[in-house]
Amino acid sequence: KEDFSDADGLRAAELEGEFAELDGWEAEPEAAVLLQGLNIPEDLHHLQMKELNAGQKIKVLLAQALFGKPDVLLLDEPTNGLDIQSIAWLEEFLINFENTVIVVSHDRYFLNKVCTHMADLDFGKIQLFAGNYDFWLESSQLAQKLQSQQNAKKEDQIKELQEFIARFSANASKSKQATSRKKTLEKITLDDIKPSSRRYPFVGFKPEREIGNDLLQVDNLSVTIEGKKILDNISFTLNKDDKVAFLANDDITTTTLFKVLMGEITPDSGTVRWGVTTSQTYLPKDPSAEFDNDLTIVDWLRQYASKEEDDNTFLRSFLGRMLFSGDEVLKKVNVLSGGEKVRCMLSKNMLSKANVLVLDDPTNHLDLESITALNDGLIAFSGSILFASHDHQFIQTIANRIIMVSDNGVVDRADTTYDEFLENKDVQQRVAALYA
């Protein structure tokens, strides 16, 4: 426009004022802070979405939801697809967020750290509890226990009254007392206690043999995928009692490592040597290829059963413990949900009787009840475990060794918990140096 009139100037001033009220001048710096907090480096900030990988796209979409200080944040599984550092940053962001957050999550540590209230949805009804996840769990279980105890006392009282009435109702001297007790009996009502709709599968791994002295030796492992170095100079030795959590800044690193260990990817260089007494069973991060057929669940599992186990009664019973009951075992595996596929894979893993479990993000797609059951099963497992996870509590309660993996080597800490690993300043400096 050639001439900028006084009216144009006034309108421009109004728009600038509105822009300032919306914190427009802070928009770009705020976006940068959010992206960097979610581990999107600055050199990627001006790329188009189509140029990012799947994990980076998820982070950008999450940053988009967090942007602009909304009145209400609705977050559905926000930790899915995030690395450990991004989850820790998100926890602090939400703790300090001044407005309302409504979140669905299966990460117990995340719920404990972030939430001030829990909304319990069961039997189509919702009940609000003040407190975090652990407080809700204890409170709800205590409430049900007290209700059951009260019902038991009422049942004893009912039995006692019924016995008195039956004994003395025909006795003239006791008839008034019997009538009084009848009235008391009529007033007693038992609480209707419905069992929770939540169901816990049974997860238990029993190795067929013990591991000898040698578990796994990895020397100078390097892997390149599509021209990008994923692993470089990776070396470590695992011992028979190790339950190892493998961490990385992105999932492709740990997934690639596990695929190499299981012989699915040939490394550019380096060697992998399993101990002669070891037997491995593997749960991949994406098990979809295992279900690319039209077998029923029971026939799919039959492929992995021994001769003694190849029996419909046994297989149906086994699947029943994994929450596939009745005719559900006749469902085709190619239509299963993500959680159902993981439960099938865990069934296969259990039938293998292997003494080494290799689990790539095993809590992915599982509900809280299944995560809890798996968590307990792995704690009780007498063999060795190599696993990757983003679930803080899962790692903390299972792992006795932490290995951080990158395209620049590893940081390896034995005889440690996850919390100790995170709190050790020297270790965290070494981790930072991996990605410098």
Which residue stretches match the model-derived regions?
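ABC-family P-loop ATPase nucleotide-binding domain
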Residues: 193-215
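Leucine-rich amphipathic alpha-helices with coiled-coil/heptad-repeat character
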Residues: 4, 19, 26, 154, ...
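Short amphipathic coiled-coil heptad-repeat segments
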Residues: 32-38, 163-167, 183-188
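Generic structural signal for secondary-structure transition and capping sites
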Residues: 99, 163, 170, 190-193, ...
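ABC ATPase nucleotide-binding domains
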Residues: 147-161, 165-167, 174-183, 199, ...
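Extended non-transmembrane interhelical loops and adjacent amphipathic helices
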Residues: 9, 83, 179-190
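ABC ATP-binding cassette signature C-motif
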Residues: 1-149, 208-436
